[in-house]
Amino acid sequence: MVKSMDTSAEVRDRAVATIYRTLKLVFGLVPIVAGLDKFTNILVHWDRYLAPAIANVIPMKPSSFMHVVGIIEIVAGIGVLLTPWTRVFAWIVGLWLIGIALDLILAGYYDIAVRDLVMAISSFCLARLCAVAPARVAATDPRLRQAQTG
């Protein structure tokens, strides 16, 4: 039996599915890991990135503020990764990253701010991809195709 060549639609569907799954994994796991690290400071001492202008106006210690930030990041990551509202949570993660980038700019960490802005744009791409990706992902999964055809 000769295997037929993939159609351009099948190639496109696989590419979209791969991009979608990758972005969903990245914007699910990275916020969860960063959020958990706000409680342990294993990766970095997060307090040092809080701009003095912000540290002076928040009604708590910087470490407590970072714990609140960590909880928000964990919830956002779980929302992207494990809920049917990936699109909404991807927008939230992107906006959150812009907020972090603004703090980093105020603190003088321009290089890290640029990286967070690029991540925000990527998160917005995931949100937009959610409009077409679930159908493309289903089209590339043999188990789902078999269930649809009976």
Task: Give names to the regions the model predicted.
Residues 1-150:
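Membrane-interface extramembranous regions
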